[in-house]
């Protein structure tokens, strides 16, 4: 547990670690397969539960604000305890990472099925659900088949596009 964020440290002691950020409908334990591979390369893996996932089913919303706060807690710990820190992130975890870590000195990043254009994804969700921008602004929250559409979240992603990412990255 790191500052009330449930976490697992996988692998034998090393000066290298991967911060493992899972995707939607996942949890920290799903890092086990990745951690086994990373360990063969001499790396530990630090995985954790995002809000509304794993041990945090009754916690805050899993949104960019809470996700980024958790990622910063985890990275602060990682950079304080390992010499070489890399990143593995999946889906929404990659989007949160793009927001939280754009200026962090990660050695490298591995993105698995990353969400890199959240604005496009939300606009598609609105289209699929028959929701207009005006309707979302008026109602503030509208359930959809994928997830709840939220006006504040939509406004955040429009005003905070990902414009910089200087970490060497591979898309898996």
Language-model features and meaning:
Residues 87-89, 112:
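Short beta-strand immediately N-terminal to the catalytic nucleophile in serine-hydrolase-like folds
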Residues 23-36:
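The serine-hydrolase catalytic nucleophile loop
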Residues 89-97:
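Gly/Ala-rich beta-loop-alpha elbow adjacent to hydrolase catalytic centers
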Residues 15-23:
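Short beta-strand element of the alpha/beta-hydrolase
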Residues 35-57:
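Conserved alpha/beta-hydrolase
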């Amino acid at each position: 547990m790191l500052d009330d964020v449930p976490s697992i440290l996988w692998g034998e002691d090393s000066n290298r670690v991967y911060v493992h950020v899972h995707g939607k409908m996942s949890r920290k334990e799903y890092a086990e397969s990745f951690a086994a591979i990373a360990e063969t390369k001499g790396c530990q893996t630090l995985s954790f539960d995002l809000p509304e996932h794993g041990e945090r089913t009754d916690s805050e919303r899993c949104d960019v604000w809470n996700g980024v706060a958790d990622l910063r807690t985890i990275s602060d710990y990682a950079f304080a305890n390992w010499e070489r820190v890399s990143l593995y992130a999946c889906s929404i975890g990659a989007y949160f990472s793009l927001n939280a870590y754009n200026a962090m000195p990660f050695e490298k990043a591995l993105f698995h099925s990353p969400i890199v254009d959240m604005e496009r994804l939300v606009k598609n969700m609105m289209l699929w659900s028959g929701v207009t921008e005006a309707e979302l602004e008026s109602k503030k929250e509208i359930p959809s088949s994928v997830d709840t559409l939220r006006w504040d979240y939509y406004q955040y992603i429009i005003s905070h596009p990902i414009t910089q990412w200087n970490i060497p990255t591979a898309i898996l």
